[in-house]
Amino acid sequence: MNGIKVMDMRCNKGDSAFLIDDGITAILYDTGFGFTGFEVAKNIQAVLGERKLDYIFLTHSHYDHALGSAYILRYYPTVKVVAGSYAAGIFQREGAKRTMREMDAKFAEKCGVNDYQFLGDELKVDIPVNEGDVIQAGDMCFEIIDLPGHTRCSIGFICKEKGLLLSSETLGVYDGEKRIVPSYLVSYSDAVSSIEKVKKLDIKRILAPHYGILNEEQTKYFLDNMKSASENAAHKILKSLKDGKSSDEIISDFKAEFWHGYIKEIYPEDAIDLNTSIMIELIRKELM
């Protein structure tokens, strides 16, 4: 992509960790789980060789995106971690780290990993950022855009010169084809506002969480359909609530629509059950 390579560093399909490299400066976009962190670091080493990893860009504070950074720091102690100011505060909370530990260990066990060191206390943010801040990463320049909705701390990174957006789950989780899974966990209205903000930008390519770099056709499809995907899901949930359906029934309907193919590979069932239950309560609160 015009001098920039984007490479998949994941070692588990549920991970989200992608390397952006222009041959001079290397950036890791999200870092994946804690229990896979060392393996992700080894994948990076296999690509960079003796070169250093310059930056870690974190889109939000969830364990499957951010926890791996603590492990990667063991391999690359000079790397600069960039995350939203809100996320930087979350990393200081003992309760948040305890939740990360529990969720990471639970999924690790499902993947056959039962014994590994938890490094949550080593989470850090070197460069806390807010809307409009600019990160000059060598010759690559990224502007920060706040994208709340999935979490309060969700952000995106825009390289305007390349028309490249490093996206957030607030916009939806994409399977690369025709399915965009809504994922608003703190605010439906904020998610829609974030989507509308992105639609106004000149975006040619998207690096999508849990998927990777989209080609131009995929990018256009995603930009054209991300809003309707979130709105349609909200309206279906609202109708189900008004029809008297239980949360379990609504979750089952949601999974019947979205939990297939690639999405099923990257989205554990207990996670989609939990997240959909949260979305149901958001819709109940915001739209009823």
Regions found by a protein language model. Name each.
Residues 27-29, 57, 81, 164-166, ...:
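Residue-level marker for buried hydrophobic side chains located in beta-strands
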Residues 217-234:
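Short, electropositive alpha-helical surface patch
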